[in-house]
Amino acid sequence: MEKLGMNEIREKFLSFFESKGHLRLPSFSLIPKNDKSLLLINSGMAPLKPYFTGKETPPSKRVTTCQRCIRTPDIERVGKTARHGTFFEMLGNFSFGDYFKKEAIPWAWEFVTEVLGLPVNRLWVSIYEEDDEAFEIWNKIVGLPPERIVRMGKEDNFWEIGTGPCGPSSEIYFDRGEEKGCGKPTCGVGCDCDRFIEFWNLVFTQFNKDEQGNYHRLPNPNIDTGMGLERIATIMQGVDSIFDVDVIRGITNFVSQIAEVEYGKDAEKDVSLRVITDHIRGITFMISDGILPSNEGRGYVLRRLLRRAARHGKLLGINDTFLYRVVDSVVENYGEAYPEIIDRKDYIKRIVKLEEERFKETIDQGLTILQDYINELKVQGKTVLEGSKAFKLYDTYGFPLDLTKEILQEAGITVDEEGYTKELEKQRIRARSSRKEDNSLWEQDIYSTLGDIKTKFVGYDTYESNSKVLAIVKDEELVEEAEAGDDVSIILDVTPFYAESGGQIGDNGILENENVLIKVKDCKKVGDRFIHIGTIERGLISVRDEVKAQIDVVSRRNAARNHTATHLLHKALKEILGDHVHQAGSLVADDRLRFDFSHYQAVTKEELKQIENRVNEKIYQSLNVHIEEKTYDEAVKEGAVALFTEKYGDKVRVVKIDDYSMELCGGTHVKNTNEIGIFKIVSESAVGAGLRRIEALTGLAAIKYLEEKEEILKEASDLLKAQDKEIVSKIESLQQVLKTKDKEIEQLKIKMASILANSLINSAISLDGIKVVVSKVEDYDSEALKALGDILKDKLKTAAIVLASSTPEKAIFVGMATKDVVQKGINMGAVIKEVCKVSEGNGGGRPDMAQGTGKNPSKVEEALNKAIDIVKEQLKN
């Protein structure tokens, strides 16, 4: 058989199924769209789920894709085995109620034997033990001998997750030869050894499983197949590991050059090389798809991969930041198949380098502390690290728990994960959000039971429509009618209401006829159904009733102003900050807009001014807004901006602002930029690593904001008795005066503290040659008490000091001791702990310095008497 590279196999697969009437779709983003059950896309089928469930209409009944995927459950095994990886590509052909087994099986066989040229005598298949139909097709139509068709049980050859669509599967195996086997007489398809490699899974979704566990035949069964590109490449190239495949090996070699080590010479170093090679691929595509490092959700997965790869770089002796350089190799090897990473290369490298530098600042210190923990545990003969210590490594040094666990595992130590979790909750630190898949992958919500009900949206052209009620949902149940006071969700056949999407809020308004008035507060979309959410103000509404649907026109126009302004802002950001800027999220409301975007540092005052001026310049130029429908490919070729996180059909809506801006967008817009009136930025802030946020106002909201600012300016001018232009210099002058006064006050405090210290020294008692000062001081906080204690220590040279103060709510205690006194047995941590207990509080610290508070300030004197007793006792012992 011919040796084929990954890029060749990918293209051959997609071209083959195109020849069978399939629509080739580009890989979807790793960020799932409208799917809370998934953190990241982890299979070829995952982004197509809405088509399988009927929530959305597929662009074709036959589809083929090569989908990039991320899976991290086996992250600890990556690099240690030949097959495990977190990033992979899944080839697939799919049928949505079109063809079934009679086509899917022969096509699969045709591809592997005729296109790939795999030898027939080395191919085996497995089927579900009760699937006689699949057996007949493999045997009679394909011509595979019965002995090469292995029947297997539900665990191996039946696909189901919770309830919903499911069905038997058939898998194709490649026999790598006896020399790769385990040598057991029972060795065959399904054996755990490396001889028989499963590389293509054909799933026949022909049943629907109900909550009672019963299976019902689907009227229109589906086909869902998946073939791991890396795995079939190992077969085609005759190699044992995915890390020896051409494209992936190219990245490994690049890392080897940086590390100055040769791959294949040292088992431990090879593990690190493979970890880096795997992780940098996922890192590159995650950042390209708009994910940024953070401490939760997808961002946490990315940070975890980055820091794990960085640590393995350190194990290879690479002490400088280097991962950002490896991005070049990923782009070189994958850019042909995924040209978007070529365009985003500089941005990806910048984010990787920033995160590397952030981790580099703390990793050495963190590793030293972790090694100390390991040494302590070994001395103590223990094998479990306290959860609080693992948390400290995470909180202070940025070590994800998994990284700590992995390093400890190498030393035969585990982590008290329960204790770690408790620390997270106690400290109110947001932990990584490992969203688990729902019991049902298919999200059988109320709206998915409505069959072919669809809503026609007419809101681009009109603000009202005569509509029919198709369904009413009340208390999460479908009902035939609802009455005044009920909160309802209503689906209409036709609507002018814009449903929340693309960052733009849903319309509000009313539904009414002579019998009913419903105040609609929001409108959302589930598949092709528009859900009008509101409250019945009067009357009764029933399914099939006719109503007039009217939106709040003022609210819609304000949202349109903000949406068009958002497009102008996006373009202005790219022009002024650079092409690396990509939209990462937005909110288009009727009273404001918010825009999140990728940028590696705070936007300067001067840049913000330029951005605001650029947007207003385009508003005043009265640019026309043109809206057209085009094919996705046409729009992108013409330069339309598409968002990473959106999923587009074959036909797209293009919003073009003359020759200035062009984006794919389903939102509502003004007809001319002069309708926006004015654009005003009100804030710029960070929302994550490499992620910034601008909030802005337009139209009357912006004018009102400026009027409020003007009023504040006038009040300041009146108070300062200064002209507007003089306000800043007047404030600076006052600040200088205050600074001088503060210095004078500070000097007076020092003098007073010195006088007070002399007074306290005069009242000090002597115990075994040690001066002991125990006293209450009025109107001092803990910092002032510590400063006074330092003066006393300096003056007395050999001293034990306990000072207290109080407010109506609490008592404050500070204990201090000189080094020689500590050597004589004084421990202020123990003294303050007991003293605070007397006044119903808590405290503690080091032998030479401790502090605490008490809830009962009336017991300060009693507590101080206790302090003298404890000091005496400590000196005796």
From Swiss-Prot:
GO annotation, cellular component aspect: cytosol
Catalytic activity: tRNA(Ala) + L-alanine + ATP = L-alanyl-tRNA(Ala) + AMP + diphosphate
Cofactor comment text: Binds 1 zinc ion per subunit.
EC number: 6.1.1.7
Binding site for Zn(2+): 563, 567, 665, 669
Annotated compartments: Cytoplasm
Protein name, entry field: Alanine--tRNA ligase
Co-factor requirement: Zn(2+)
Function in brief: Catalyzes the attachment of alanine to tRNA(Ala) in a two-step reaction: alanine is first activated by ATP to form Ala-AMP and then transferred to the acceptor end of tRNA(Ala). Also edits incorrectly charged Ser-tRNA(Ala) and Gly-tRNA(Ala) via its editing domain.
HAMAP family assigned: Ala_tRNA_synth_B (MF_00036_B)
NCBIfam families assigned to the protein according to its UniProt record, in alphabetical order: alaS
Family statement drawn from the similarity comment of this UniProt entry: Belongs to the class-II aminoacyl-tRNA synthetase family.
Organism: Thermoanaerobacter pseudethanolicus (strain ATCC 33223 / 39E) (Clostridium thermohydrosulfuricum)
Annotated Pfam families: DHHA1, tRNA-synt_2c, tRNA_SAD
Record keywords, A-Z: Aminoacyl-tRNA synthetase, ATP-binding, Cytoplasm, Ligase, Metal-binding, Nucleotide-binding, Protein biosynthesis, RNA-binding, tRNA-binding, Zinc
Catalytic class of the enzyme: ligase
Main location per the UniProt record: cytoplasm
The record's note on its domains: Consists of three domains; the N-terminal catalytic domain, the editing domain and the C-terminal C-Ala domain. The editing domain removes incorrectly charged amino acids, while the C-Ala domain, along with tRNA(Ala), serves as a bridge to cooperatively bring together the editing and aminoacylation centers thus stimulating deacylation of misacylated tRNAs.
Annotated GO biological process: alanyl-tRNA aminoacylation
Gene Ontology molecular-function annotations: alanine-tRNA ligase activity; aminoacyl-tRNA deacylase activity; ATP binding; catalytic activity, acting on a protein; transferase activity; tRNA binding; zinc ion binding
Superkingdom as given in the UniProt entry: Bacteria
InterPro entries, A to Z: aa-tRNA-synth_II/BPL/LPL, Ala-tRNA-lgiase_IIc, Ala-tRNA-ligase_IIc_anticod-bd, Ala-tRNA-synth_IIc_core, Ala-tRNA-synth_IIc_N, Ala-tRNA_ligase, Ala_tRNA_ligase_euk/bac, DHHA1_dom
